[in-house]
Amino acid sequence: MTSPPDKRIKRIKTGFFERRMEMAKAGFISGSKILTHSATNFWASPEEKERNNKKLMSERAQYMASEMGKLKGSVVKIGQMMALYGEYFLPKEITDALHTLEENTAELEWSAIETQLLQELGAHKLAKLEIDETPLAAASLGQVHRARRIEDGQELCIKVQYPGVAKSIDSDFNAIIQLLTLSQMITSKRAFEQWFREARAMLHQEVDYLQEAHNTEFAAQMLTGDLRYIVPQVFREFSSKKILTTSYEPGLVVTAAKVKKLSLRRRNHLAKASLDLFLSELFAWGEIQTDPNFGNYRVRLGDGKQPDQLVLLDFGAMKKFPPNFLNPFRNMISAAHHNRRDAFLENAIALEFMRADYPEDVLQNFADVAMEIIEPLAANYHNVPDFALNPKGEYRWAESKLPRRVAKKASQASLSKYFALPPKEFMFMNRKLMGVYSFVKTLGAEFNGGEVLKKYLS
């Protein structure tokens, strides 16, 4: 089944000048709206000004997201990354609008994809494959096609990077910096600059498909013999820096009706596997797949003999964390698990979340918020609300209202004056942890996360 003509594009705009001009135009238009707004807002009451300011910010944010979406390529990927991590340096209206940048975007026409395949693999290798011209999925940086190796019928998945995407990353980052600066949308310049340096390096890594092939093989090696997980096999013969070919691994999305209808025991099995994978990355591997997107996972239902399994699909965003971050962060998790507040704060200060000379009530308020974040992984649930536990005393991930409770406690703690900009590594780690929580919550699981964590703390 092919996509409608209006959902397919012939080429990606990759020229430095045309992409830079599109971003500059968007920034100029967005910035000019501020001048118009200031004039019309001059005589408004304070309440009206606040309402008008929020309305303007929302309109400007939606316009910016719309313009970024038109360019596809790394601009869209950068926007999606800002949606995940922008809470540290952008207004909420901006991150909300950026969440509308759909990952499953318009596909590139087969002729352009075929040209890319020929350039990267050559006609001789392509002759060994039958490739479905209709993609399984289209994203911001490339699209995925199903294929078959002719000689033995091996089912394959081929990820093809869009032409010119890798070359446009740096110019796209510079254009977005210009856009946000002209639009006056950055709330924390220091956080913005720190995140952008890290994000730029991460995106360059993500478009190196040979690195992703290595990451995939590393994960497969680390999970050898663990029947809870399926890692696709890499086919190096049909891979390059811009092409990644793996075994085709079918499965259901976690939100599929069949998954939701599984028994609690089976859903718990999958949820524990998801949490255990993250904890293995954190405590054993030292390398973490930082992208929390649900699209990176599939569920393969068992047949009675084989258990239900998680299919792990994307290792492009694997990140190796330095020991000077990992060790204190692990210690923070351990201290929060055991409710050892002094040890927790000692490591938080080591990571410069807090400072030792801050008022004691500020330090304790920070510890309160952190203990609540780690609540599902606690050694015991003495301080957990009754509604978050089932009759067996097991944690009800979907019913815990944890995000709402954490947000409320954080706002009441008045930490903004003291809370330092976290290390850049924390931005990625925190988002991954929240992604794992969300995955487990979506499965409607009921189990004590501390039981999964404790084996890593011995």
Question: Model-flagged regions — what are they?
Answer:
Residues M1-A273, L277-L279, V299-L310, F315-P323, ...:
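Broad phosphate/nucleotide-binding scaffolds in NTP-utilizing and phosphate-metabolizing enzymes
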Residues N339-R341:
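Conserved phosphoryl-transfer catalytic core
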Residues F283:
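Helix-to-catalytic-loop junction in kinase catalytic cores
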Residues P328-N331:
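Short amphipathic alpha-helical recognition elements used for nucleic-acid or partner binding
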Residues E287-F294:
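Catalytic-loop of the protein kinase fold
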